[in-house]
């Protein structure tokens, strides 16, 4: 927004412009009565983003001032829309008293809502993490920090390549990303909402260390194991400063920072996460993903933890076996069936505690926290049956916290209002002084009944009543027929059709006392509300530990239920290289198919590291490859897998080159996308990687594609020695196992019945003998006349004769293409000619002979 002189504006608009100048890059919601108003460019932008009316208010330099507004009671819905579009909003409230203000009511920005720092329940995706991140770049190296403000989970890492950095961005999917003004690889930031440019100095190392030490109350960062991660700390320092600035309060729930070591995880690049459809399908939705099948958790915080596990598979066998042991006990004992319903009543304690830490928790947050704590005794009874060490550790952290539960039971009403603003939150009996003022504020009904009875008897007026309304306050009402009996000290206040209303000094005095008591009771209640936070915050760490334990117990119990319901087996994790699966199934496809899923084995080891997979389209090659990767992934998450048995060696990375589409925005063709992903695999795969390669080379000419596919397969097999599944339609590649050790052919079979085809979906040893392309084309609805013509062409090709209408030349061709084309007779004859040995006449004769060979 351009700078605007405030001299020619009203005092209110001058105040607005001053506040806007302090928040120039974000929308300012300026409270005016029952509305939040936006002006100038903010109003234009908000009207577009929120689809609200753009109006005008006053003028500036002779031009009307654009204005847009939203009702204050509906603000959460509008904030949610803006946050989803990556926008940030400064909320400016009236903090002064309009009755005592001279000039505009005092206002100030009380909070800044940004996509990565929201904690309000209405603005957050319930079952997905909401992260804010900062990225730092220096001479090809990266520092990366992420924070989940709703849990206090603060992590830092140092990806050493652009490819690794892109994979981290894909894995963490931050809703807000901070970057320096001099950040160079800006292509990493493309196609993202919520990017925030920050000053260079916020990323300085010394500033970062000071910010972090101030946050944690430490002298140095050695105890967190991040002292030497200087690039990561630069990002983390900027991040913590930004969050403090937006929250306008302390952050007591952020007590540590964790170094995310890539060596501890199985690395999945961006293409692999997309192709395996872990938490998002290829269309961008949640349906038919691995998470949809596995996530039957009882709590939202458990659901978020499971997705973190799925996106960051672990290489450490101790951690994995600990999870598998726990799942095994819950499954075999059947305790998962008891735990799930108990956890359903606990709710999202993790995010409630974040709002408690930020002192933004609402009355119903504390009511839900109370309800959660009330479930712990029953859960504790169930967990007494645990025997496995890790389950016992979780049970110890999820024990009842009686003191806090009792405090909340005494303090909060059973069904409190949404906000503290109008009171009515704290329970009767919690505070004696509050109860006294409330009794008075509620009108002291007993006093009024006594006054009514006395006045009625004293003046012999049986229609006399004492009443109250918001306009006239307390009054005495007498019917028209008896109004002549009203004593002289009754002062008429209102005349109705059938009655007169009066006021007397005693009633006026009581009214003043009652009205004063309401404001007094509200002030006391708000003070006690803040004191309640002070009583709860010292227990924050214990409460967070409880929430973390319940989250993990929820995930383990859920995975036990999934293993039991879906007939999964426990994988055996080995240190040796290899994958040996019997009766493997695709976890998603088997659930969405109406027909029984055909289970298949796979065996990869040092003597059999690459499978060349052939077979018809729709035969199941891609499903077979993906299920192998998903089973390996699930084993490294520490959960049971869809197979009869599975032995999984340690993996360092999983790569997939499956399918492709044009990247029009970047000007990259399908083939370019395919080759970029292939290059990434050939550069970064190791002998401990699992590589899935599907139809390499099909986006270019036959010989180019075949050559690239052959060379890629040979490189993976001989130079990298990665465990590889290589699906292809180039049947020449089935010769590779005859040329190199450690390779084998397998195929997915099909059976033809006349013009129909039946896909067997069973993996067989050896190469396929047909591709069944015409049968698949017929299934797809290609016109019969086209299929008929194709069959004729196929017969000509297979017989070695192809008629080319443009010439009379007959092309002879083998049934299978060769990798290196054979030299033609003309080329061979020409190669044998030495021009220096020929006379002019001989040269002319040789030329005629060569022409005759064409």
UniProtKB/Swiss-Prot annotation:
SMART domains linked to this entry: MUTSac (SM00534), MUTSd (SM00533)
GO molecular function, one term: damaged DNA binding
TM helices/strands, residue ranges: none
Residues involved in ATP binding: 615-622
Gene3D superfamilies per record: 1.10.1420.10, 6.10.140.430, DNA repair protein MutS, domain I (3.40.1170.10), MutS, connector domain (3.30.420.110), P-loop containing nucleotide triphosphate hydrolases (3.40.50.300)
Keywords (A to Z) from UniProt: ATP-binding, DNA damage, DNA repair, DNA-binding, Nucleotide-binding
Domain of life of the organism encoding this protein: Bacteria
Keyword DNA repair included in the entry's annotation: yes
Entries under InterPro entries matching the protein: DNA_mismatch_repair_MutS, DNA_mismatch_repair_MutS-lik_N, DNA_mismatch_repair_MutS/MSH, DNA_mismatch_repair_MutS_C, DNA_mismatch_repair_MutS_clamp, DNA_mismatch_repair_MutS_core, DNA_mismatch_repair_MutS_N, DNA_mismatch_repair_MutS_sf
GO biological process, alphabetically ordered: mismatch repair
Cellular component terms (Gene Ontology): cytosol
Biological function: This protein is involved in the repair of mismatches in DNA. It is possible that it carries out the mismatch recognition step. This protein has a weak ATPase activity.
Family note: Belongs to the DNA mismatch repair MutS family.
Protein name according to UniProt: DNA mismatch repair protein MutS
Organism: Aliivibrio fischeri (strain MJ11) (Vibrio fischeri)
Gene that specifies this protein: mutS
């Amino acid at each position: 927004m351009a700078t605007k002189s405030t001299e020619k504006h009203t005092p209110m608009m001058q105040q607005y412009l001053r506040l806007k100048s302090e928040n120039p890059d974000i929308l300012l919601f300026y409270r005016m009565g029952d509305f939040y108003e936006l002006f100038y460019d903010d109003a234009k932008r908000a009207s577009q983003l929120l689809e609200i009316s753009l109006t005008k208010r006053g003028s500036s330099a002779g031009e009307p001032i654009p204005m847009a507004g939203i009702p204050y009671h509906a603000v959460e819905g509008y904030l949610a829309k803006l946050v989803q579009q990556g926008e940030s909003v400064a909320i400016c409230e009236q903090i002064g008293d309009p009755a005592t203000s001279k000039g505009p009511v005092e206002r100030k920005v009380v909070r800044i809502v940004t996509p990565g720092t929201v904690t309000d329940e209405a603005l957050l995706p319930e079952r997905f993490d909401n992260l804010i991140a900062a990225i730092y770049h220096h001479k090809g190296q990266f520092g990366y920090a992420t924070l989940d403000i709703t849990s206090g989970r603060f992590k830092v890492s140092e990806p050493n390549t652009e490819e690794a950095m892109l994979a981290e961005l894909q894995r963490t999917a931050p809703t807000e990303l901070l970057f320096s003004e001099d950040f160079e690889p800006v292509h990493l930031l493309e196609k993202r909402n919520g990017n925030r440019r920050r000053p260079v100095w916020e990323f300085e190392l010394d500033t970062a260390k000071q910010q972090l030490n101030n946050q944690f109350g430490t002298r140095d960062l050695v105890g967190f194991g991040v002292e030497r991660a200087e690039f990561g700390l630069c990002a983390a320092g900027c991040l913590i400063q930004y969050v403090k600035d937006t929250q306008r309060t302390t952050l007591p729930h952020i007590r540590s920072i964790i170094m995310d070591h890539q060596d501890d995880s199985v690395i999945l690049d961006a293409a692999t996460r997309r192709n395996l459809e872990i938490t998002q399908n290829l269309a961008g939705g949640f349906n038919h993903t691995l998470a949809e099948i596995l996530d039957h958790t009882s709590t939202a915080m458990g659901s978020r933890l499971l997705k973190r596990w799925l996106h960051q598979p672990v290489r450490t066998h101790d951690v994995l076996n600990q999870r598998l042991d726990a799942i095994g006990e819950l499954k075999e004992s059947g305790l998962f069936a008891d735990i799930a319903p108990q956890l359903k009543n606990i709710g999202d304690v993790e995010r409630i505690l974040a709002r408690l830490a930020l002192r933004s928790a609402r009355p119903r947050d504390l009511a839900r926290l109370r309800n959660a704590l009330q479930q712990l005794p029953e859960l504790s009874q169930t967990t007494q049956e645990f025997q496995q060490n890790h389950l016992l550790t979780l049970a110890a952290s999820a024990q009842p916290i009686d003191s806090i539960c009792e405090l909340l039971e005494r303090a909060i009403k059973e069904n409190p209002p949404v906000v503290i603003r109008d009171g009515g939150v704290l329970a009767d009996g919690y505070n004696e002084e509050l109860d006294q003022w409330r009794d008075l504020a509620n009108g002291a009904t007993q006093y009024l009944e006594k006054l009514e009875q006395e006045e009625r008897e004293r003046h012999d007026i049986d229609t006399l009543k004492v009443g109250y309304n918001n306009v006239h306050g307390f009054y005495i009402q007498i019917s028209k027929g008896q109004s002549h009996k009203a004593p002289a000290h009754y002062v008429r206040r209102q005349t109705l059709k059938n009655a007169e209303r009066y006021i007397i000094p005693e009633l006026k005095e009581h009214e003043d006392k009652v009205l004063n008591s309401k404001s007094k009771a509200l002030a006391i209640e708000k003070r006690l509300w803040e004191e309640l936070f002070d009583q709860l915050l010292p227990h924050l760490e214990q409460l967070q530990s409880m929430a973390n334990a319940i989250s993990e117990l929820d995930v383990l119990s859920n995975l036990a239920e999934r293993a039991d319901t879906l007939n999964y087996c426990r994988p055996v994790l080995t240190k040796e290289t290899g994958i040996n699966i019997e009766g493997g199934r695709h976890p998603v496809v088997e659930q969405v198919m109406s027909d029984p899923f055909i289970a298949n084995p796979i065996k990869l080891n040092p003597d059999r590291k690459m499978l060349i997979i052939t077979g018809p389209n729709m035969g199941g090659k891609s499903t077979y490859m993906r299920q192998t990767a998903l089973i390996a992934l699930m084993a490294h998450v520490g959960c049971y897998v869809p197979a009869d048995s599975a032995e999984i060696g340690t993996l360092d990375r999983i790569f997939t080159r499956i399918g492709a589409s044009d990247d029009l925005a970047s000007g990259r063709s399908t083939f370019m996308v395919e080759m970029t992903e292939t290059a990434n695999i050939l550069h970064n795969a190791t002998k401990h990687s699992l590589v899935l390669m599907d139809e390499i080379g099909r986006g270019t000419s036959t010989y180019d594609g075949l050559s690239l596919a052959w060379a890629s397969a040979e490189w993976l097999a001989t130079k990298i020695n990665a465990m590889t599944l290589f699906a292809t339609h180039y049947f020449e590649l089935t010769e590779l196992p005859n040329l190199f050790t450690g390779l084998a052919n397998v195929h997915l079979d099909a059976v033809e019945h006349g013009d129909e085809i039946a896909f067997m979906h069973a993996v067989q040893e050896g190469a396929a003998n047909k591709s069944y392309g015409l049968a698949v084309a017929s299934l797809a609805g290609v016109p019969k006349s086209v299929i008929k013509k194709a069959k004729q062409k196929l017969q000509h090709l297979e017989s070695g004769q192809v008629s080319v209408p443009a010439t009379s030349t007959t092309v002879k061709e083998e049934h299978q293409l060769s990798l290196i084309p054979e030299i033609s007779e003309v080329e061979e004859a020409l190669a044998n000619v030495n021009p220096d040995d020929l006379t002019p006449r001989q040269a002319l004769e040789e030329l005629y002979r060569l022409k005759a060979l064409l």
